[in-house]
Amino acid sequence: MKVYINPGHDLEYDSGAIHTDGNGDVDLRECDVAARIGALAKQYLEAAGCQVRMLQSDNLCNDSEYSDRPVAVCDDANDWGADVFVSIHCNACAGHDARGTETWCYAEGTDGALLAEKIQAQMVGSLDTTDRGVKVMPGLMVLKHTDMPACLVETAFIDNDADAELLRTGYDDFARAIARGVTDYQQTKMAQ
């Protein structure tokens, strides 16, 4: 199985959501968390026999108009012929006490929804996070412009202190859960 991993945001141009310490200084960035989880998930998937390609960029499609970032994530995944696509992110909800994990797919009843369900179940079961469920988000670029089953994982709320601590210390647990979700999806599809 060919798995395309897209850690969310960009290390240089758009760090995504952040967590700040008691002094108001940024101590955790979404792009860093996603990159670390993605790299570990890649290792676990390769150990399970998957071919894995990973690209972290905020250039999602060729029409994104980022001339300084020539490779577009969705186009690269499509051209490579990935069997599944997983985008890894951290959620944020400034000014609220939101917590937990949710996974987004393009539409209900699709292979992308099945992939999202398998990853969501593994993350909630392994990390005991609040289960915010699988949600349909057809407007998201990485779900709309990929040719293969795709999902976007919101691991936890980076701006919630308790979730931020889990993100800070649980990289490996998140990565293992994502990898197991992908292999659970693969096993389900093979059994059909």
Predicted regions located by residue number:
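Loop/turn elements at helix/coil->beta-strand transitions in domains of secreted/extracellular proteins
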Residues: 1, 45-53, 80-85, 130, ...
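Active-site histidine-acidic residue metal-binding/catalytic motifs
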Residues: 1-73
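Active-site-adjacent mobile loop/cap segments within catalytic or ligand-binding domains
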Residues: 4-6, 12-19, 75, 80, ...
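A short, glycine/acidic-enriched catalytic loop
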Residues: 12-29, 91-118
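Soluble non-cytosolic domains of exported or imported proteins
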Residues: 28-36, 67-71, 109-114, 165-173
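Extracytoplasmic/secreted envelope proteins and their assembly/folding machinery
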Residues: 38, 42, 74, 113-120, ...
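Surface-exposed patches in mature extracellular/periplasmic domains of secreted proteins
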Residues: 52-57, 88, 129-136
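Active-site-adjacent substrate-binding region
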Residues: 110-135
